[in-house]
Design a protein with these regions (language model features):
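The feature captures the beta-strand-to-loop junction immediately N-terminal to the Walker
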Residues: 38-40
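Conserved ABC transporter NBD signature motif
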Residues: 60-73
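Catalytic Walker B motif of ABC-type/P-loop ATPase nucleotide-binding domains
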Residues: 150-154, 159
Length: 253
C-alpha cells in the first residue's frame, strides 16, 4: 500500500515568495490498482509524483507498506517522466546492462518485447530519438525495472494516437496483478478504459476520488465527472464568443 497523509509542498521562501503546490493531500493506493491522476495545469500532479519519489522535500508522510520511502525500498518505485531520466548518450543496450545491477528484478523479456513493439533501435543513443521515441523509451525503462509501483507523468506526449491506443492495450495485457500504475495525464478519453480509478487534483488538493465502475453505475463518463468536480461552466465558450463578436467592438487603430 502506498499511503500519502497530509502531504504539503510549498515552493519558494515561506513568508516571502511562497507558492503552495500541495495542500494536505491524503491518498492511499493499493497494489494492483490502475489510477488516473487528473487535473488542470498547475494542479500539483507532477509535484505529487516527485514527492513520492523523494525528488522534492515536503511536509507530511509518504509510506510503502508502512515504511518511509528510502534507498532500501526505492526500487519498488519506477518513474516515467516527459522530462526524461535516461542517459542521452547511452544506447538502450547500454541502459539494459546498467539497470540490471541496481534492479535485481529487471524484466529482460518485457524490455525486449516493448523495444520491438515501438521499433526502437538497441544500439542508437536515445538522445538522437524523436520526442515521441524518447517518451517511449522512458516508459519502457519504467516498466522493465521490476517495480511494484509505476508512476507515469504525461508519458506519451509527442506520440500519435495510434501508438497511444495500442500501448494501453499492451499494458493491460502485460501488467501482473501486483503491479500498480499511477498515471498523470490530460488525455481523459484515451485512458478511460485503462484506469480503474480517477483521482482529481485542483490547486494542490484532492477534489475527487472515485472508481470508473462507480461512474458507469451513475451514468457518467470520466469527462463528465471531471467537469462536475471542477464546476465547469458549459456556456463559457458561447459567452466568450458573444463578447468577441458583439457589435460595436472597438478596433485597434
Amino acid at each position: 500500500m502506498l499511503e500519502i497523509k497530509n502531504l504539503q509542498k510549498v515552493y519558494g521562501i515561506p513568508g516571502v515568495s511562497a507558492k503552495p503546490a500541495l495542500n494536505g493531500v491524503d491518498l492511499s493506493v493499493g497494489q494492483g490498482e490502475l489510477v488516473g491522476l487528473f487535473g488542470e495545469n498547475g494542479a500539483g500532479k507532477t509535484t505529487l509524483l516527485k514527492c513520492v519519489l523523494g525528488l522534492l522535500g515536503y511536509a507530511g508522510t509518504i509510506t510503502l507498506d508502512g515504511e518511509p520511502v528510502t534507498r532500501a525500498n526505492i526500487a519498488r518505485l519506477s518513474f516515467a517522466t516527459c522530462e526524461h531520466s535516461f542517459f542521452p548518450h547511452l544506447t538502450p543496450a547500454g541502459h539494459r546492462d546498467f539497470y540490471r545491477e541496481p534492479f535485481p528484478r529487471w524484466r529482460e523479456k518485457r524490455f525486449q518485447a516493448l523495444m520491438d513493439f515501438f521499433r526502437l533501435p538497441m544500439n542508437k543513443a536515445p538522445g538522437s530519438f524523436s520526442t515521441g521515441q524518447k517518451n517511449q523509451f522512458e516508459v519502457i525503462l519504467a516498466l522493465s525495472q521490476g517495480a511494484d509501483y509505476i508512476l507515469m507523468d504525461e508519458p506519451f506526449a509527442g506520440n500519435d494516437v495510434f501508438n497511444r491506443e495500442d500501448f494501453y492495450k499492451v499494458l493491460l495485457g502485460i501488467l501482473e496483478p501486483t503491479e500498480t500504475v499511477v498515471l498523470s495525464t490530460h488525455l481523459l478519453e484515451e485512458v478511460e478504459h485503462f484506469v480503474g480509478r480517477a483521482v482529481l487534483l485542483r490547486a494542490g488538493a484532492v477534489v475527487g476520488d472515485t472508481s470508473v465502475l462507480e461512474l458507469e453505475e451513475r451514468g457518467m463518463d470520466l469527462m463528465a465527472f471531471v467537469k462536475s468536480a471542477y464546476g465547469y461552466e458549459p456556456d463559457r465558450v458561447s459567452r466568450a464568443l458573444d463578447r468577441l463578436t458583439e457589435e460595436g467592438e472597438e478596433e485597434t487603430p
